[in-house]
Amino acid sequence: MNGGAERAMRSLPSLGGLALLCCAAAAAASTASAGNVTGGGGAEGQVVPSPSPGLRDQASSPFPKTAAPTAQAPRTGPPRTTVRKTGATTPSAGSPEIIPPLRTSAQPAATPFPALDLSPATPSEDGHTPTTESPPSRPAPTTLASTVGQPPTTSVVTTAQASSTPGTPTAESPDRSSNSSGVPPTAPVTEAPTSPPPEHMCNCSEVGSLDVKRCNQTTGQCDCHVGYQGLHCDTCKEGFYLNHTVGLCLPCHCSPHGAVSILCNSSGNCQCKVGVTGSMCDKCQDGHYGFGKTGCLPCQCNNRSDSCDVHTGACLNCQENSKGEHCEECKEGFYPSPDAAKQCHRCPCSAVTSTGNCTIESGELEPTCDQCKDGYTGQNCNKCENGYYNSDSICTQCECHGHVDPIKTPKICKPESGECINCLHNTTGFWCEKCLEGYVRDLQRNCIKQEVIVPTPEGSTILVSNASLTTSVPTPVINSTFAPTTLQTIFAVSSSENSTSALADVSWTQFNIIILTVIIIVVVLLMGFVGAVYMYREYQNRKLNAPFWTIELKEDNISFSSYHDSIPNADVSGLLEDDANEVAPNGQLTLTTPIHNYKA
């Protein structure tokens, strides 16, 4: 019996008190065996008696009470009582001591003893005994009231001892001191063994886990690296993919703006929105621009280009003769059609007559050339302007030498030929290059009237224009001898002036004719000379062309042939010394003498 029990026993005044105490302990043990035995968490069983309300109202016991044990699930089978103790030895520390069960004979109690405070406790893992209240379904233990009228001064606490090894039941033998007192010990009760908690095999991935040997012993969950998931950290998280080259889970890095989700395939390619491309969906496809929160926008090129700048959206490589940021304009030299299609057509403007560009106004069907060159006019710059005429489809300026008034005659010259119209300043001719009859050019190239000095009968002179001289005849004066002389002089001057004017008019034409005649004569003479030389050479060739003969020796004759066709019947009699040889009709000579008699 431990020290606490011994002190309690010594406090009893007599052996009768000891007997009454034994009876009370036996009654308490009998009550505990009736249904107050509980198992503690698979580690040890404990007796949980619940004190009656009467005992709770009594004065406190000199022994320190332990806290109520933690509620445990009831065991199946016959109830057993196990008495255990904790590692503590002093009551002041709150650790219970071993009190072996006492078996006594059933004796009716004359007077009730003070109620025993039976507070079994289950030790916790740290060595202290936690307390718990008994379940309400369990009956309260039997208490014995004292026969004496004095309040009790002591109480007996039944405790349980925690085994040295959790979960291993041990049988305690009764204390020898109890045997010396004559109380038989209670048979030891052993607790049924309980199964230990299951231990999980971690089996963590060497690549995906932080530690292959460390995991949660309850769930088996391993500690994973970033990007790995699963019980064993053997799969990739969302937003990661397994790179088969390195065998690791790598992040997808899908763009939140261009990708449909954060997921990617086994190659690391994200699923892109419409108009977005790239393995991470972070750039625009051809034909799209403006990568942003909504993805990419299609290029606005009026169906004239398939590509544009990925940042600004400016169209590139505009087709169909168009230009502009969105291919909405026509190139230089083209104009948009008046219909809804707005197709670009070439301007009907020649680059020779205009700048080549044109415009079309709203509501018009034909374009107008922007700017015509000098000398051209019209909607398409295909007409000659006033003061110009058409010379081989080119507008050439009229050459009237300033003798046509452009105000009175805007055209100045005829558009089809260039002949000047309404020559002024006493001029005439195709280009107004001649002076009228009776006019001559002065030093400034102006046509002025020609004047001559005419003597009068009084001995004075007067200035008379050439025109008046040719049209008027002076009246004979008193001096008849002077009159013929005067008339002769006047007419002589007039005739000389007229001849000079006529010579000036005809000289250029005659000069041209003379030059042409000389050229023709020279050409004819050269042709005659060449023909004469050719005839002479032919004659010499015919004269010197002698016949050439070839002689072929055969067995009994000599054959010859001429290489000149102009002598078909040449005389070959001189080829042989013997004149008696006859010439065969076929050109063969018959030999009448031995072969050594002729000469080659």
UniProtKB/Swiss-Prot annotation:
Positions annotated with a glycan in the UniProt record = 36, 179, 203, 216, 243, 265, 303, 357, 426, 466, 479, 498
| The keyword Glycoprotein belongs to this UniProt entry's keyword annotation | yes
- Biased composition of type Polar residues is found at 167-182
Q: Show the ranges annotated as biased composition (Low complexity).
A: 150-166
Protein name (database record): Multiple epidermal growth factor-like domains protein 9
The gene for this chain is Megf9
Disulphide bond pairs: 202-215, 204-222, 224-233, 236-249, 252-264, 254-270, 272-281, 284-296, 299-308, 301-315, 318-327, 330-344, 347-358, 349-369, 372-381, 384-395, 398-413, 400-420, 423-432, 435-447
Region entry Disordered: which residue ranges?
Answer: 33-199
